[in-house]
Amino acid sequence: MKNIFKDKNIYILSVENDQRDKCKSYLISKKALVEKRFSKKVNIIITSEKTILENKFPVNTATKLGIEIIDYETLSRDIERFIRKTQPTSSNGSTSTTTTTTTTTQKGQIVSFKPTSSTSTTTNVINTTTTSTTSTTTIVDPIISLIVPPSGSNNGSFQIAIFGIGFLAGAGFRIKIGNDNGGGGVFASNYEFHSSTSVLCTIPNLNIKCGQQPIYASNDGGKTFGFPIQFLFFDTSIHRIPTAREQDGMVLKSQLDNLKRAISNIQTMESILMRRISLLNGNHDDSKSIEQIFIQQQNFIESGASQLLLGNGGTTDQLLQSLEGSEYSSTNDDGENDQSDDDDDNEDDDDFVEKNSNQVKEEFSEREIKIFISSPFKDMQLDRDQIVKVVIPRIRKLCIERDIVLSYVDLRWGVTSNQSEQSTGLSMCLKELEKCNILIGLFGERYGWSSQEKQDPKSQQLLQSTLDRAIQDFPWVKNYRDSSITEIEFRMLLNQRQQQRNGFFYFRDPYYLEEVSQMDKNNFVSEGQRSKEKLEKLKQEIIKSPFKSSEYRRPTNLSDVLYEDLEKYIDKKYPSGNCELKGFEKERFLHSVFIKNLTKIYITNENYFMEIDTYLSGSATSSGSGNKSISIGSSINSGLLSSLKNKPVFLIQGESGSGKSSLISNWLKQHKEQHPEDLVVSHWIGASPSSNKFTSILIRIMNEIKNQIEIDQKIANGGSNSSSSSSSSMFSTTSTSSVSWLPEIPDETFESEKIVSEFPQFLQYVMSHPSLNGKRLVLLIDGLDKLDPRENSQELIWFPRNFPHNVKVIVSSIQGSRQSEVLKKRGSHILSILPFTEAERKSMVRLYLQKYAKKLSDQQEIAIAISKSTTNPRFLQLLLDDILVFGDYERLNDRIKTLLRAKNTSELYEIILDRIEKDYDPKAKGLVSEFLKYIWAGRRGVEMSMLSTLLLKKNIDPAEWGSLLVLMEAYITSSSGVISFLNDDISKAVEKKYITTPKIGIEIHTNLAEAFEQSGDLNERKVEEYPYQLLKSENWESLKNTLTNLYVFDKLYTPNHKVDLINYWNVLEKQTKPPKNAAERDDPIPYNCSNEFKAIISRSFIQASGLVISDVWFRVASFLEELSQFDGAEVLYNKCRELYINNSQNIEAAKVDRAMGRMYLTMGQNDKSDSKFRLALSIYTKERGQEDIEVAITLNLLGTLATNRCKFDEAKQILNQAMNICESKYESNVLLIADIAYSLGSVCFVEPNRKLEVAEAYFARSLELTESKVGDMDVAYARILTRLGSLNIEKDTYADAEAFFKAALKIYEARLGIDHSRVSQILRHMISLYEVQENYKMAEQCCIRALAITKKIYGNSHNLVSATQIRQALLYNSMNRKQDCLNLLNEVKVTREKEFGPDHKQVKHIIDLIKEIDKPIVPKAPPPPPPSSSSPSASSLLMKSITSLPIVNGQAVLSVPKPPVSRGPNGIPIPPPPPPTIKLYTNMVSLQSVMKQNVGRIPVAQPTSFNSPVQPPSPRTQQAIQQGQQQRQQVQQQQQQVQQQMSQKVSSLQQQPQQQQQQQPSQGYGNRQNTPLFQQPIFQQQFQQNRIQQPQQQPQQQAYVGDMLAQFDQQKLKRVQNANDRSGASQIVENLIGKKKCSKPVSLVNKGYMEESNQIDMGALFD
């Protein structure tokens, strides 16, 4: 085409933005002038075909003026060619092969039919008919569209299948790999053609460069090539070749894609031919039309499009109408024909963004009411206050009920002095009014600011400049230069009436002036006679207008009148019962409103956005999903990208109020604009009443995915109206059931476990469906920390650990929350939100206030921005919100200073509450304080009905606090009728401000408790709140009665409330009962859970209608067992077993037997436990068979019992049998499999030939399974951690052992309370750990605390208490606190004498132990040397006295004068004689020697001689002795001095054997090589025979299961290396046996609890 555009003025109309930009560039290159608006000077209009057909302005005007009109599609090919020349070639080429262009000329017009690609199904139709020419151009260069497989080895020598368009089978066909069109590269070989669209070829055996390489196709021997497609060559050593199955799948998928393209091409050609027929028919005047000839010849087009000719008589016009409504009609539509003289590019851009940004916003945009309040300022302050503080809250409540969004604009101080100086005030007001759909106008006696008012020249000049500025934006204002600003605002509604806008005008009674003080009256009277006349004229015009107008007496009356009018307006537009949304639609509406509020103002942080985008593109294409990816080298840091790979979840965390939700919502808005092809589903916890339940989250996500897929299908099918016309084609790929393949979605009635299990299956099925090929799903869940804590949701068991490759998940939570900890342990990528910078704060202030048409001065903005408190976004927003409702601009500076005095958000809330009290409780009736105190006192909030009753007792009218409720919607939230605070900061502020004494808090809790007591039904709310309120009100007797109520217990003893029930009893048992007599007053009786329930069961008749009493007693007994109150549990177990047997319920009786066996196992009563287990096993086997799940559970317990009884082979056999049953039939019972794995690991850990690595593997597997099912804060999880701690002690990895123990201790304390038997069990293990490390201080603290807990549970005389006391005494002995040790042992002796008698062996054992510790240690003298033939010389006496001294490191302790050195015959000094052999003692008893022995058995150490036979002196020694005799006189003078020094060292010598004992290498942690006083089997037998049972005490244990680790065979344990080994013996042992190595299973490496537990301050646990 020749250049017809040179020097022409061209106007582009109704063309999409991206095409508009390309067209502009093309026209500029043709030296054309592009006009922004249509005018007479325009020579050519370029527009869409649809706009031409509509023939509206400016097309119709251009036609009359003879201006050329060109269809944009006519130029599209030239424009695309121009763009390709000016921009780098894209890696993905075009997929079209043939372009047919039909050009029609009429009256200088140039019109073209749309060039259609292979993937297009649209057709342009016009009715212009004249001369036509048709030209067809064939593109000979073949185009590649797909390669299978998409990657291969860089070594080559493999085949690939290439699919595309225009392949010509012949010698000239080439496939080239690498380089560009200019030559070079590698050519493929062995071409095997299957069609013109597919070919099989071989990549040659060459070393090709790794990475993405282009592959081209050529039909002319390689001279010219079509557009390339990228192929990934990888290093064979890193990547693998796809399997044959994978390649076959890709080939089939590609064939299906080619079939779809073929159908699309046929449909395209079909539509072109049909249009040509219509044109031919229009160019002839024959009576017989073309379609009739066509029908007579019966040459039907096989695709079925010819049926369009037959519809409704088959006329051409009807044909065109059918085509316009069919799927071939143009989709290039702007939605409405709104082009005018004011149309420009910027407006088009805004329209485009608005229409494509947010579909939800468009869907619910009609459900929004925005009010603009207009009036003169000086005399209408009180009136406007009534609207803002009274009417708006009441109307907002009504809007909430009708699912309507309400907002308002009040510009009392929004026009700052700076804006006034710049004269932008009126323009800003009119712009805000333009966005509103309701105007509320107020008038008193003042007309308002106008030229009629007497004012100084400066004000007059300011008014004129303000009007001039407004005229620039709103030209119609020039007609009202003499009017007041208020009238001009009114005129915008009166003169430009629109259907969607409405107005309410109110005129105050002139007699109100009589109530105004004389001082203020000047602000209320008219400005002058002319102003009065203009005001009266305006009022008359308003009264005659269709808008509502009324009069009111005083400001207080205005609220009633205005509310009534607005209520009628809402009732008419949104009628009650018809407009409310329901179900899924209402959820979508509430979430859309929530998002809209978050996206109004946001200071974009590009770093945050980039990191989220990087996560999404991290591995988008690695799995072949077809998702778009971002170039690593261009815009993504490769290090960050590699760190994001394999990260299942992207976690955004930060402090409360740090802006996490705003970040997600605004990123979401941008992402939808940039990636409309993605499926994006967001869930905002807190947006709706049910949004915090994890089941609702999963169900809503599945529904949203289904809804979006349905919408996408409708859009792809050309809208809902295209179904009928599209069905005429036999090749149509659409159907009315296009989404029928979607699986059924569960609803709220399903069990939570089923919903959780079906959710990942739903995602996997949907995202792998062929119709979603290349789609990516982005899931966003905001506010995980706000989850309802019931059903253990905070452990995120419901949250999938793995997602499909094309699903990306982004979540947010408060930093440090339980949810964040869980996601960190799962390896999620973490983005931490930082505080606001000063620049961000300043921008936030300006933009936030600008949204409400207000602005602060520069000084005020700076004061807020530099404050340290405003670094928190929530703090800053609260401050700005308070400023917005502050109506007095004159005192605004003082208000800002007051707000900035707050150091944190909680203090800011206190200041805000002061303002709310002054505004809404001026008479100090306690409206605000009482309202907030009751919300504070509720555990999970307070019901509105109950709050109304409570406030009514305080003489507060419900209508008053109803408005307050709406007013404070920014601070409170409502969920299912329950009101609660939005965050903890508000609760802290209310507590600090109003709960000033404990008495006030108790009174509030008491009122709530009474309210719950009066409520009839025992619903979930009452079960959750009533005991809590009794606890907080310290009403102990009522709390006891409530907890022992069988109906309440049945509701509380559930997974959701069990922890609460345990905590209630833990607190209650620390209290005492009200005294009934003087004796109880002097000796108060504490509450005891076991005694209270035993008292109930002793009654003759128990009222429990509706409950199965035997089942209830079984549950009570299980609860008492959990509390370690075994005596009461045993009584109740026997009671419910009796009931089951009487009713012939054998299975239930077996359940009781097994539970009792488990309890006896815990108590260490192995014989009773074995009897109960075997009885239960026989019943289950008989009733249900040998492979029932109940049999497996019982076998697991029997295996544990066999392990405790050291029957390890039997234990393995039983446990393997249980495991086989589970793995064959009950794979889903993960917890049971984990428990059996734990039991097998315990056997491997404690058996004689221990296998620590095997045991650790079992424990690791059990830990992994348990965590997947119940999380890492469950008691079952803590039990495994305890065992791993003991195992690591044996492996000498004390740091890991301590971490495991601390993690288990944390769980037990959180779940079971700080005084539970499991806690004492952990503490006893930690005593052993710290004693081995000689950290006696920490060991003592653990021992003291464990002893206190054990005494509380078992009583002072229990055997386990005595054993713990003995461990503490020996610990004191190791700490050289001998007297404390003896005192404690004497206390144990007295206790055992009372229980067993003075002659019992345990008493004698304690006595022997006391004697051994109290006995002074005196070293024995070494044997004398052999007698000499001669008399002893002085030298021999000296040596004898020296050798009698203790030896340390081979030298005598005392220094004595050395005798003269004797020399031999050659002058060589004679060597001294060797020192005599020293006899060592081991009669010191230490904690290490007994800490792992059985309970109640303490070994007494016996002296062991390590001396060797004394050797006779050597000849040299004899010679030295002979020479020493010559010095006898000299030695005798020194002998007396040496003996005196020896006597002074006797006390120090007593300690040396103990030190030597500690320096010896020994075996097993805590075991010494000594001979115990009693052998274990004999001692246990005698102990059982002689033990005296006390009815008041609990049964004595044979071996406490919690101390099972202390029952190992000590002779077979190796001594661990002591951290503070001073003798060097450990080094010798290490050299002999080699250094130990610790190899943890992979699942235990880098566990989060290891680091967390190491940070626990153990000292803080004992404060």
Curated annotation (Swiss-Prot):
Coiled-coil regions listed: 1516-1547
Ranges annotated as biased composition (Low complexity): 89-105, 1518-1528, 1544-1563
SUPFAM superfamilies: E set domains (SSF81296), P-loop containing nucleoside triphosphate hydrolases (SSF52540), TPR-like (SSF48452)
Biased composition (Acidic residues): 333-352
Domain of life: Eukaryota
Transmembrane stretches, start-end: none
Signal peptide extent: none
SMART domains: TPR (SM00028)
Protein name according to UniProt: TPR repeat-containing protein DDB_G0287407
